[in-house]
Amino acid sequence: MNIQTNPLLDFSDLPRFDAFTPECVTPAIDTLLAECRDVVARLEAPMDQVTWKDFVEPLEQATEKLGRAWGVVGHLNAVVDTPELRAAYNENQPKVTEFWTALGQNLALFEKYKALKADAGYAALTPQRRKIIDNALRDFHLGGADLS
């Protein structure tokens, strides 16, 4: 199975459980982690102005894909437990956990979220977008980002 046909990388509709095999897991997760790391690296760089479109949107899009794919893997691991799937899950869980942990303690991103909330444009955002920003700040706090 190649990256183009991997059902874990098809976000056009509901998950294609019927096309899933344990061999899909590592290539898909590695691809999504690489994409997420690239987005994070780009967003860590200095920005003239932190905006929803240039900061939150790309981060949310990248991490949503990873979360969705990993959610499918976790769900299937819980309901269709096979030795092959368990091995794929156990192989990838440390990588996924490491990414989410590092993201939650990323001081550069934390500062950008704080800047976005402090900006005068924050009040003009939709309630849903303000909630996403507030939840991100809460998650950084719970992850220990503001302990240093």
What is the predicted function of each stretch?
Residues 1-147:
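Zn2+-dependent metallopeptidase catalytic domains
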